[in-house]
A protein has these predicted regions:
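Alpha-helix C-capping/helix-to-loop hinge sites
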Residues: 38, 53, 57-58, 74, ...
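C-terminal accessory module of base-excision DNA glycosylases/AP lyases that mediates lesion recognition
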Residues: 1-38, 126-127, 141-211
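A positional/architectural concept
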Residues: 16, 22-53, 58-69, 73-76
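Short helix-capping/linker segments at secondary-structure and domain boundaries
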Residues: 58-66, 112-116, 152-157, 205-211
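Structural motif
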Residues: 40-48, 95-99, 188-196
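Alpha-helical ds-nucleic-acid-binding substructure associated with the helix-hairpin-helix region
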Residues: 8, 27-31, 59-60, 64-137, ...
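A general alpha-helix detector
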Residues: 49-54, 86-90, 128-132, 164, ...
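Short alpha-helical scaffolding segments that buttress acidic/His motifs in well-ordered protein cores
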Residues: 50-55, 104-108, 147, 198-202
Length: 211
């Protein structure tokens, strides 16, 4: 699997990858003609990105953005040491649940004491980086995959457990039932080594496909 930071997955890269996928997948080729190309998703890496992923878990995008706005107001420098220096209750007042405060605090502590180094992820393979992130409290496989896709810009990641991707695959392929994670992985195996681009397209398709 991939290792290290790659070139950014920008508009040019998305077009290149989707042309390769479409040449080998008729359903993608037909849908691409209807809805066009997705936009890039490039996020910061490191502590701030992982904090944002924790904040966004199980809430709407709008709610997550509002909470992150309040977090930035109390943390002009979003870093692990600055987070640990916050007064008790500050993150709760910003809108994080008690459990998410525990996760963020645990993440910050792991970075400060040297148990976890986000920079080291750049030199790890995809599977190694995912395993490293999954060792942290509150960050599971999906969270790790999202970090690799958008923060490390890894080109061949497919979060098969993502419900929206599963529903998009079901609609794209005209299946009666939503595929599970294993079935989703198998369905896009021929998209390698462009599965991150394929994922972006499926999210785009999920929002824009006709009912």
């Amino acid at each position: 699997m991939g290792r290290g930071r790659r070139a950014l997955i920008d508009r040019r890269t998305i077009r290149k990858g989707l042309k390769v996928i479409a040449a080998n997948d008729r359903d993608v080729a037909q849908a691409l003609k209807r809805i066009g190309y997705p936009e890039p998703r490039i996020r910061p890496d490191g502590f701030e990105a992982l904090l944002s992923i924790i904040v966004s878990q199980q809430i709407s995008t709008g709610a997550a953005q509002s909470i992150m706005g309040r977090v930035r107001a109390i943390l002009p420098e979003i870093s692990a040491p600055a987070t640990l220096a916050l007064p008790d209750g500050a993150l709760r007042k910003a809108g994080l649940s008690g459990r998410k405060v525990e996760y963020v605090t645990s993440l910050a502590q792991a970075i400060v004491v040297g148990q976890f180094d986000p920079v080291a992820l750049e030199q790890q393979t995809d599977s190694q980086a995912i395993a490293s992130i999954c060792m942290l409290r509150g960050l599971g496989h999906w969270s790790a995959e999202v970090y690799l896709m958008f923060s490390l810009q890894r080109p061949d990641v497919f979060p098969a457990g993502d419900l929206a991707l599963q529903r998009a695959l079901q609609k794209l392929k005209g299946w009666d039932n939503r595929p599970n994670a294993d079935e989703s992985h198998a369905a896009v195996a021929h998209w390698m080594p462009w599965r991150t681009v394929g994922s972006l397209f499926l999210w785009h398709f999920y929002r824009g496909a006709p009912a």
